[in-house]
Amino acid sequence: MRPVFQWNLGTRTLELGKRTLIMGIVNVTPDSFSDGGQFLDRDQAIAQAERLLDEGADIVDIGGESTRPGARVNPGAAKSAESRKTSDANSKSAIAASAVNAAAVSAAVSAEEELRRVLPVIAELKRKHPAAVLSVDTYKADVARAAVGAGAEIVNDVSGFRWDPRMTKTVAELKCGAVLMHMRGRPEEWRTLPPPGDIVLLVKRELKEWAETAVLAGVRRERIVLDPGFGFGKSFDENYPLLARFSELQTTGFPLLAGTSRKSFIGRTLASNGKDAPPEGRLYGTLASQTALILKGAHIVRTHDVKAAVEAARVADAILLAR
């Protein structure tokens, strides 16, 4: 039976385990693998979020930077504008170092740009739908703080609090909900990562370590949900064992989120005539994976296709209750 948790978001508590919660995805980005560019405009992003709420989303997750395979990520952008100005004023060498760093991460998204994308969407959604549970998908502490100030109640960090050294303290201070996701390496490194050995044991061990580190740093245990990060630094041959043995992650002692929506490993399984199924052709494969994950203990499913996921989750939940 799936364990029941009370997820403390600071402003309210969500019960996890009695039924599966559905987290709908809104990418305010030009380059996300599935829907990049579709919702970059503020009004389009808000309209999409409202559609997801109408379809039954329990949570809407809003992101302003893609972490698709091959994407450049910018942990350095997490440094606040004020602290950058201070360090730049201290010495010419700091200015030079900053210029070199900026050039190195020019393909990544700055905190300022990420905020420009997501903050108006979060603020307007909260104004129009004050009861909606909003999540911000970011690994930058400055973005997390501003987003929670605008109405987000959850910080969904794909790096598991590892890329921005201020993130753990920031989330502890904000007293919001948190999702710690597992990722091997950075997106630009994924194609060259060495084999992990037993991927399930690795993910379980590292997620547990990262969560316990966050607890020791002041993030209350009841605020944390763990995500094994399907597709994030995992090869085709590693995603299916992680799915098949998902129930083993329950030994971490934390509630679990699963995100397989439209992922490339599903597209490859559904390949036809030597070509992977495109993201828009992966719905039924996604639903099969989501149903299996719910039956193996997932508390939250993160998805682009909310209505379909809601219906699949109802059936999977009924099966769990019948055991």
Residue ranges and their predicted role:
Residues 1-27, 212-215, 219, 272, ...:
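N-terminal amphipathic alpha-helix/helix-capping segment at the start of soluble metabolic enzymes
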Residues 9, 34-51, 67-79, 105-128, ...:
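Active-site-adjacent loop and "lid" segments of alpha/beta metabolic enzymes
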Residues 76-91, 96-99:
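Short, low-complexity, charge-dense intrinsically disordered segments
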Residues 16-24, 51-64:
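N-terminal glycine-rich anion-binding loops that anchor highly charged ligand groups
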